[in-house]
């Protein structure tokens, strides 16, 4: 299981702030049509994903306040449905300007959602920033070291409840190998490429297969084609 030293934690939060700034900067330049463009998240537009990112720092009091204002959310179960519906409600509640401001206002804060660690916050901002950028054809950088930390956390927790919030791909029988940083996990047919693409694959984003090579990547692409 991934553990963090004090230095690691400082670097991690700096990286979270860096990606929040990049994401807010991207959002500031979008047209109204782009805000309503489908994201990589099923059933969510760019606006929904951005609104979800404003909820990264909710504690118990914040969550209870949200539920009291929107009691119908209690009918949204299981967890993935709750997260989806909360993002939709938040997107309806906040204006474009308020969403961007809320993401920027999170910079410098070290609060994270109850029951999670800063590594989940990192994964959330990295992956969801790509959920916004990729469908819009925007290249939004992610630092390989940060993507590697998030990928390690996702691999280590792939059989826990934390993995239930992502689409699960059958990756245990493959070797995942980054080509831009020293990172590899698993055994089996090779799946190679940038660590950013591996992170997206670990979180169920099959769009990442476009940037991955190897016998294993070919098998995964064929499997996804058959399922389509």
Where are these regions (language model features)?
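Soluble or luminal CAZymes and related metallo-dependent hydrolases
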Residues: 15-19, 95
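A short, structured beta-strand-centered segment in the mid-to-C-terminal lobe
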Residues: 82-98, 102
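Structured surface interface patches that mediate subunit assembly and partner/cofactor docking
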Residues: 1-12, 59-76, 98-101, 105-228
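Amphipathic, well-ordered alpha-helical segments in soluble domains
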Residues: 19-22, 26, 99
């Amino acid at each position: 299981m991934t553990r963090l030293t004090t230095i690691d934690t400082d670097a991690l939060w700096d990286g979270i702030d860096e990606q929040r700034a990049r994401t807010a900067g991207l959002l500031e330049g979008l047209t109204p049509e782009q805000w309503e463009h489908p994201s990589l998240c099923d059933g969510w537009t760019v606006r929904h994903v951005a609104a979800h990112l404003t909820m990264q720092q909710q504690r118990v009091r914040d969550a209870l306040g949200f539920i009291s204002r929107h009691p119908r959310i209690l009918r949204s179960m299981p967890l993935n449905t709750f997260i989806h519906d909360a993002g939709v409600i938040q997107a309806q509640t906040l204006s474009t300007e308020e969403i961007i401001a809320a993401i920027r206002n999170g910079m410098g804060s070290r609060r994270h959602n109850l029951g999670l660690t800063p590594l989940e916050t990192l994964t959330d901002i990295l992956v969801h920033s790509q959920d916004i950028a990729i469908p819009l054809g925007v290249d939004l950088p992610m630092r390989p070291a940060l993507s590697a930390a998030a990928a390690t956390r996702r691999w280590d927790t792939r059989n826990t409840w934390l993995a239930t919030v992502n689409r699960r791909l059958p990756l245990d029988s493959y070797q995942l190998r980054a080509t831009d940083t020293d990172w590899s996990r698993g055994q089996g047919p090779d799946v190679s490429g940038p660590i950013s693409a591996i992170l997206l694959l670990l979180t169920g984003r099959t769009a990442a297969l476009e940037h991955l090579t190897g016998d294993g990547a070919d098998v995964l692409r064929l499997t996804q084609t058959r399922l389509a």
